[in-house]
Structures are given as structure tokens and as C-alpha cells.
């Protein structure tokens, strides 16, 4: 039988592992929010209650690293506490990791995910479905979208580098006309 202390100890190990896998400094609140989430998820599992994660597909597509870490956490919970959580719990845990990584609050994660999804769909539509989503270039594109979304959600001013250097802007407009139209 697992106790709150076991949940906290395991969460501490999981947060240490997550931190070792992510280059950014995570929000310190991850330990508390993840510990609470894990405790409640285990309690729900014992009561036979499972929640579907409506963002699972988007998390899978746009936050694969965080989802992989969420799956790792679910597996560690199964291995160390003998509790088999539903697959969607990996997505919920990923949302906590996204929140900690981007320093947003949990209420913003669904909106952030929707924004990244909408921008990626605009680009995919613009290029008529020809974006290769398995490439490093596409992964970098998603990273840029995530950080754009983070800055927007934090109401940070976006640096307008191109407007400060008309020569660069003119070069981009001429050399990368199609990409410029998509971004615009």
C-alpha cells in the first residue's frame, strides 16, 4: 500500500529525472503540482475512475519529449507503487512538465497547446500538407512555436529584429518569398 510519503519520495525522484532530461530550468512548482497530481491519480485509479485527456493527440504531436517523460513517470509509478495508471495520465503528467518548462500555469497549457496546433496547421495548410513532420527542421519549427506561445502567454514583448534592419527584411522577402508569406 502506497502512502503520501511514498508519493512524495517518488515524485522527487521523477522531478530529478525530468530535470536531468530537459535543458531548461523547470519551475519549482513542478514538485508540488506533480506530487498532488500523482496522489490524486492513484486515488482515482483505486476507485476505478479514469479521465480521458482531450489534448492527448496534440500533446503527442507537439510535445513528444514531455509525453515521453510522462510515460516514463507512469511506468515508474507502476514499477515502484504497483499502480497501473491509464495511458492518458502520461498526457496529464506531460501537461505539468510543459507548464514547468514554459513557466506557465496549468490553465494556460490547453490554450498554449491549441495555439501551437493552430500555427502548425496553418503552415501545413499553406504548404498543402507537404511538411515532413519527421524531420529535425519540423521539430525546430515546433520549438520556435512553443517559445513564441510562451512569450505571448507571458505578455512579453516580441523583439522585432527584422523591422530594425530593413536590409535583412528585404533579403528574407526576396529570398524566401513563400516562407515569408506563410509566416505573415
Segments predicted by a language model, with ranges:
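A cross-family "folded-core" feature that marks the main globular domain of proteins
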Residues: 1-184
